[in-house]
Amino acid sequence: TWQTSDPFPERGTGEATLAERTDGTIYYNTRCHWDQNPQPTRRRAAVSEDDGATWKDFKVVDVLPDGLQHRAYGCMGGLVRLPIQGRDIFCFSNIDTAGEQRERVTVWVSFDGGETWPVKRLVESGPSAYSSLNAGRPKTPSEGQIYLHYEAGSGSKLARFNLAWLLGGERTGDGKVPAWATQL
């Protein structure tokens, strides 16, 4: 059987992404599509400590854009936890543009389960929109790979890269890249 959770702590959100941390808590990251919310062009996050029944520690994630920045409507983004033992490395994808077109699909990296996002890397500067992420499985040929599927103009594309490539991106000023991350 299954049960629904309590609602997310803010109205006007949707198309959420979830990732379980190594301690069993669940990180919730969501789109905002209501211009009555504060900072409607930024992503929202919360955490569950009870298997997703309730959500706490709600916050606006200042460093993560939510779609086009000239209007409040958001854009579905992707989220994945990399399967690295004992580490809460998350990747998040969305568009990162000040323009009026959906473009510049970008991936951000967190090394502390979504608390900070210290690095981002542009994947493609052209048209892009909704995106999803997945990670290769340990002990398979896909181990260490990160997969980004995204809308690109009238079709879709798949990009494949690894954490080392992402670390070559731009520092956001939101937290630090830990020394151990460069040795993975």
Regions found by a protein language model. Give the residues of each.
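Asp-box/BNR beta-propeller blade signature and adjacent active/binding-site loops
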Residues: 1-184
